[in-house]
Amino acid sequence: MKTHKTKNDLPSNAKSTVIGILNESLASVIDLALVTKQAHWNLKGPQFIAVHELLDTFRTQLDNHGDTIAERVVQLGGTALGSLQAVSSTTKLKAYPTDIYKIHDHLDALIERYGEVANMIRKAIDDSDEAGDPTTADIFTAASRDLDKSLWFLEAHVQEKS
C-alpha cells in the first residue's frame, strides 16, 4: 500500500509493520463497536436499562479508541482502512448473531468478542514495541485498559458467586 511522506523518523520498515498492526486492530475495534450497538438495540429482559446504558458507554470508548488508532495510521504515513468493506474483510471477529434477544445471550456473545479483541490488542502492544514504536504501543495500552475493564463489567453480569 502506498504511504505518504512524513517527518516522523521511525524507520520505514517499522512504519510499515505498525501500520499493518494498526489497520488490523482498527477493523476489529470497529467491528466490536458495531456489534456492541447491535446488542444495545436488541437486548430484552431483566436489567435491560442498566445493560443498555452500559453498552452505550462501551461504544463511545470503542469509537474513541478506533479514532486514535486510525489517526496513528495516518500519522505514520499510511491510509486508515475503516470502511465497511475493509472492516468486513479484515476483522478477526466471527459474525455476530442477529437472532438473539435475551440479555444473557448477548452478554455471552459480547464477552467472547471483547475477550478476543482485548487479547489481540495486548499482542499489538508487544508487536508495536518490538517494531520500535513505543507511541503506538502506548495507544494500544490505553485501549487495553478500557477493553479489560469492559470485559470485567460484562463478565460480572453473568458470573455468580461460587
Swiss-Prot record:
One of its GO terms (cellular component) is cytoplasm. The keyword Magnesium does not apply. It catalyses: 2 Fe(2+) + H2O2 + 2 H(+) = 2 Fe(3+) + 2 H2O. The keyword Oxidoreductase applies. Pfam families: Ferritin. GO terms for biological process: intracellular iron ion homeostasis. Its main location: cytoplasm. SUPFAM superfamilies: Ferritin-like. It is found in: Cytoplasm. Keywords: Cytoplasm, Iron, Iron storage, Metal-binding, Oxidoreductase. Fe cation binds at residues 40, 67, 71. Transmembrane segments: none annotated. Its EC number is 1.16.-.-. It is an enzyme of class 1 (oxidoreductase). It comes from the Bacteria. One of its GO terms (molecular function) is oxidoreductase activity, acting on metal ions. PROSITE patterns: DPS_1. NCBIfam families: PRK09448.1 (NF006975). Belongs to the Dps family. 12 di-nuclear ferroxidase centers are located at the interfaces between subunits related by 2-fold symmetry axes. Protects DNA from oxidative damage by sequestering intracellular Fe(2+) ion and storing it in the form of Fe(3+) oxyhydroxide mineral, which can be released after reduction. It efficiently inhibits hydroxyl radical production by the Fenton reaction. Does not bind DNA. This is DNA protection during starvation protein.
